Amino acid sequence: MADLDDLCAARARERSDPLIGTALHVRRFLLVEHQGPWPFHALESEGLDPDVVARLVAATREVGARTILIRRPGRRSEASGRRAWAVADVENGRIRWGAWTDAADLLEACAVLREDSGGPGWSDEAAVLVCAHGRHDTCCAVRGRPVAAALADRLVDVVWECSHVGGDRFAA
């Protein structure tokens, strides 16, 4: 296990790095359930069609959004079968869920990215994301995965581990 005192989050606290204004600024997130393992660049994960990923990335850039991968804490389900996707509107606190089995099904999310979040299919339900992307940042796996597991014990259906969201030094 990594030395917790030598990880980036601990070093950032020692240096008194400012946290205000250093997180990623996006209007929306496109969340795509994918069991992993996630490589350093999560969207290059095995099982994700590169052509579909390119279209998702282009669509998210158009609307000031970002695509991140999600999975349930501590559980690994089949890499195939029915999985979730969602568009989360950060500004309005709204979310719209969909499902995919084939990579082409994810293209529906491109249209949803442009929708008004006050429309049909959108809800105020919570989604709690905890970065656990250890190949991108060790802190996220070492500190994030236990946090996600503890939260999932209390908030069973709303907690997800996620790939790196951007903005470093926030690990628990």
Task: List each model region and its residues.
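Histidine/cysteine-enriched polar flanking segments
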Residues: 1-172
